[in-house]
Amino acid sequence: MLPKRRRARVGSPSGDAASSTPPSTRFPGVAIYLVEPRMGRSRRAFLTGLARSKGFRVLDACSSEATHVVMEETSAEEAVSWQERRMAAAPPGCTPPALLDISWLTESLGAGQPVPVECRHRLEVAGPRKGPLSPAWMPAYACQRPTPLTHHNTGLSEALEILAEAAGFEGSEGRLLTFCRAASVLKALPSPVTTLSQLQGLPHFGEHSSRVVQELLEHGVCEEVERVRRSERYQTMKLFTQIFGVGVKTADRWYREGLRTLDDLREQPQKLTQQQKAGLQHHQDLSTPVLRSDVDALQQVVEEAVGQALPGATVTLTGGFRRGKLQGHDVDFLITHPKEGQEAGLLPRVMCRLQDQGLILYHQHQHSCCESPTRLAQQSHMDAFERSFCIFRLPQPPGAAVGGSTRPCPSWKAVRVDLVVAPVSQFPFALLGWTGSKLFQRELRRFSRKEKGLWLNSHGLFDPEQKTFFQAASEEDIFRHLGLEYLPPEQRNA
């Protein structure tokens, strides 16, 4: 168990000025959000505390509740660019807040009440904005910007992701990240890219990624991307790494040994682990998309087994489905109990119940690692939670389709499921980490380390200087500790 953080670190994002709640709110119809860029963190914290002391409601994170958004040293076009990005992530029918210069807030503080909004306060432009987005409003870290599941530049981002995947197959982590980050920027743009000039000044867009986009805009295809897509190496590595239990290193070794097909693997079972044999045996089902209806059925089954094994324990869906995906290739569930320590020993009991029902085709149990809290904090991305890597035997209703096709369906299908158990004190961090996306989490850890000097992983947030852990009761608390605007799961599809 991670030790509890007994006091707020001086100067931390969780300090009183940034997060305390005033005794009363005198103006219930007004909800202010202060935008940190250009204003600065310390000044924002000071103004937040001052406004709250005078009865103003100031939001810690931008949300649909905001009625007044205040910026400093910001042009009207930059403000509108920021607004467009936020509204693209907002729920349908959400009313945009007023975009205001800092002068409105200072006058309101002086008057002791919100002053009427005049034209001189507003950061607006007449007519639709033209030209590319201001680079100032495209943050460098993916965890600083909303990235919806459905965006405007799918063809461009998918091309870069193919190059990223190919780079990963060759062990080139640097090139993989370069292409992934460029693709992530495209996903976050509020409008389609139609000219290369729109990318000028945007972060993570170097010469190579720009050249790929230019070819796609001019010709509809990129020769490099098509060459990679058609190559035997890429196709074989993609095929092998889609097998349950097979990583890049194993796939590369098989390729160098001359293996090219699934039949090649079936002919040499001595090369396979038990996990890989199970993955190969059920490969057809496991390569068929898992639908949202399958996820709902699986969650019901898991919740029943968990509830019988430990009343009061909870099961939370994570992964891509929590980010809004309607289909995927595996399902992740996070299990905890509101009383710390009660979750110990739960997973084996759950697995026994599922096996007794004939619902488990394969599972591999991984015990939690008994590392010291500080050692756990130092781990960059791999967590040490107890878990089971499973292949479920999911019953199918009569007449169900297979992967959306019209052909008859067997009575069951194999589905990849991971069950992960976390103590309740670490649950918010585990939920954040297991929700993804992979790049979003990588960027969140990088931001924590480089910008805040903190260590973040699925176990906690650690201050190496103070040697203390931050407490968090929710994902929102973690974002607040890091001084970031909260992004809901649906906006983490970086």
UniProtKB/Swiss-Prot annotation:
The modification Phosphoserine is found at S12. Gene3D superfamilies: 5' to 3' exonuclease, C-terminal subdomain, Beta Polymerase, domain 2, BRCT domain, DNA polymerase beta, N-terminal domain-like, DNA polymerase, thumb domain. The record marks G433 as: Responsible for the low discrimination between dNTP and rNTP. It comes from the Eukaryota. It is an enzyme of class 2 (transferase). Mg(2+) binds at D330, D332, D418. Residues 323-332 are annotated as: Involved in ssDNA binding. One of its GO terms (molecular function) is metal ion binding. The keyword Acyltransferase does not apply. Its EC number is 2.7.7.7. Expressed in a number of tissues. Abundant in thymus. Belongs to the DNA polymerase type-X family. This is DNA-directed DNA/RNA polymerase mu. The lineage of its organism: Eukaryota, Metazoa, Chordata, Craniata, Vertebrata. The gene is POLM.
